[in-house]
Amino acid sequence: YHFFSTRPAMSQADYFLKKSRLRKGDLPPMLDVELSDRRIAAMGGRDVLFREMLVWLKEVGRRSGTTPIIYVSQDFVNRYMPFAPEELKKYSVWVARYGEYKPYVHLLYWQLSPDGRVRGIRGDVDIDVFNGSEEQFNRYLRTQTVK
């Protein structure tokens, strides 16, 4: 899981891979993009953001042997993804959207609540669901996890 910043994407990818201990069967690496409009503008705008995201996604994918996932908010999907290059739209997305299900992207996971409760864990936890059946999830685990 990598929280994307405005630093050069290749150095972020190098850092992520150096610090990660990816093991066989792990879920694919995740690129969490939660930059403010101001920070996106400061880095050169949405086209620069998209280019940098692709650098990270391709490099981490190449070196990890699996296709990373993009984690974004529904607001990001609405405001930025319509302008994303087709190459970026091919990546699966984990959307944080609380309330109504309305992704408009190739949704893989949906974070539907930031304040769920789970027995054995103190405090709030995110509640997430896979967008598919149990059979589809098992197939995903067999084919898309780290090798």
Could you describe each region identified by the protein language model?
Residues 11-14, 74-78, 89-94:
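Short amphipathic alpha-helical surface micro-motifs
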Residues 3-8, 34-39, 74-78, 99-102, ...:
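Solvent-exposed loop/turn segments at secondary-structure junctions
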Residues 64-79:
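Aromatic-lined carbohydrate-recognition surfaces of secreted/lumenal glycan-active proteins
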Residues 84-147:
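Functionally critical loop-and-helix segments that line ligand-binding/catalytic clefts
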Residues 47-48, 52-53, 78-92:
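Conserved N-terminal glycine/acidic-rich loop preference
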Residues 1-63:
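Substrate-binding cleft of extracellular glycoside hydrolase catalytic domains
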Residues 1-2, 27-33, 68-71, 92-95, ...:
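Structural recognition of the beta-strand scaffold that forms the well-ordered cores
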